[in-house]
Curated annotation (Swiss-Prot):
The protein's name: Probable cytosol aminopeptidase
Residues involved in Mn(2+) 1 binding: D270, D347, E349
Cofactor remark from the record: Binds 2 manganese ions per subunit.
A GO BP annotation: proteolysis
NCBIfam families in the record: PRK00913.1-2, PRK00913.1-4, PRK00913.2-2, PRK00913.2-4
Cofactors demanded by this protein: Mn(2+)
Keywords, comma-separated and alphabetical: Aminopeptidase, Cytoplasm, Hydrolase, Manganese, Metal-binding, Protease
SUPFAM superfamilies from the UniProt entry: Macro domain-like, Zn-dependent exopeptidases
Broad enzyme group: hydrolase
Keyword Cytoplasm included in the entry's annotation: yes
Reactions that this protein is recorded to catalyse: Release of an N-terminal amino acid, Xaa-|-Yaa-, in which Xaa is preferably Leu, but may be other amino acids including Pro although not Arg or Lys, and Yaa may be Pro. Amino acid amides and methyl esters are also readily hydrolyzed, but rates on arylamides are exceedingly low; Release of an N-terminal amino acid, preferentially leucine, but not glutamic or aspartic acids
Presence of keyword DNA-binding: no
Amino acid sequence: MLNVNFVNEESSTNQGLVVFIDEQLKLDSNLIGLDQQHHGLISKTIQNKLQFTGKYGQIKVIPSVIKSGEVRYLIIAGLGNEEKLTEAKIEELGGKILQHATGCKISTIGLKLTNRISRFTSQTFASLVASGAFLASYRFDKYRTTLKEAEKFAVESIEIFTDNSTETAKLFEIKKLIAEAVFFTRDISNEPSNIKTPQVYAERIVDRLEPLGVDVDVIGEREMKNLGMGALLGVGQGSQNESKLVVMEYKGGSKDAPTIALVGKGVIFDTGGISLKPSSDMHLMRYDMGGSAAVVGTIIAVAGQKLSVNIVGVVGLVENMPSGNAQRPGDVVTTMSGQTAEVLNTDAEGRLVLADAVWYAQEKFKPKCVIDVATLTGAITIALGNTYAGCFSNNDELADKLIKVGEEVNEKLWRMPLHDEYDAMINSDIADMANIGNVPRAAGSCIAAHFIKRFIKDGVDWAHLDIAGVANSNKASALGPKGAVGYGVRLLEQFIKEYT
């Protein structure tokens, strides 16, 4: 794990030294001495616009011309236009710096802050850069046994020179705690499905949350049957691995404080069931529990900070497998709410899991607000690509807050429509509703949202986040490698702070 330190006095023991230059290409007053020490290397570089323009995110790694001393590289990072800098951009810049240092095999980095930023305190700037670097340091290579030494290389430490190291370290500790919650979400999402069975996943939740003072209850199939959870149980009945409902309760607020319920889809592996998916890219269905992982990660972050809020998390953990005992297209299931659903497509299973999970959360905990998170539809990826998650809500204020926070932490949401005509499309001839719409390939994400909406009680504020396009990525970003992104943890953690 990357070691991050904040110190008041500069050290010359780091192999790489980072400096920041904006698009005006002017040296900070605190860089003049350093530039002279390195025989004008920084000033010469920024005077040559073919080498460096100062645009945001540009990183230039230059071998030092000094033969003595520990500093082997100067790393010049472009800030762009200071007025356009956001906290999210500063964080991503920290990730880019770490990635370039890793590529150049620089094991220790010193970071010299800039004097040219007036909109952020030096403590805030330093903690954000450190947070981005820490997030970018994540790896999932536990099953790779033949890695070459060069592939194993990782930056060991970052040392940030700041005039208030104690205060900056306090800010970073909170960000580090949140990042570690993101790492749990990434880890469990990246885990192969033959390892993370519903039972194993549930055990990992217990092991991670109980030491933080979170009450965790793991409900098995017998109890779910007694509760009438026919929708969730129907999805998992084709698997030899027993389905689980994991209930997490964090009581950090007063008894009369409102409860926020987070509900996550945890389909450990989704073959599509009898409505079998194509084999191409089916292996990516190990990420179909990304919503549940985001819920667990959020509760880790909230409980770790001991926030004064009441949060409950409910995640349904199932495997959607074909077998002689699997659910069939045309089956009718009775949900915990008493409503019935005709299963016309067994690959539209996530909404069935959520139907019972959101109802359970409302019945037991009487929350003021319910937010469900799910890799629910391929249709949302067609609509929004891999940039935005879809946000459906019955409350404009709730949706606006979520979208605002999403912009702040760079986990973007786009408001999607709800309409009575969409709701009418899931009416069934033989049951209360069907799990797909009656117009093929039409409004798939909206149809799925309306299915869940039928299980939200009157007076409950509700948002549904369809994260199918953003939960995992086939390419690296500034804040992490390809694979599980950990989307939703930072969004929901920040929302909870602001909402309460």
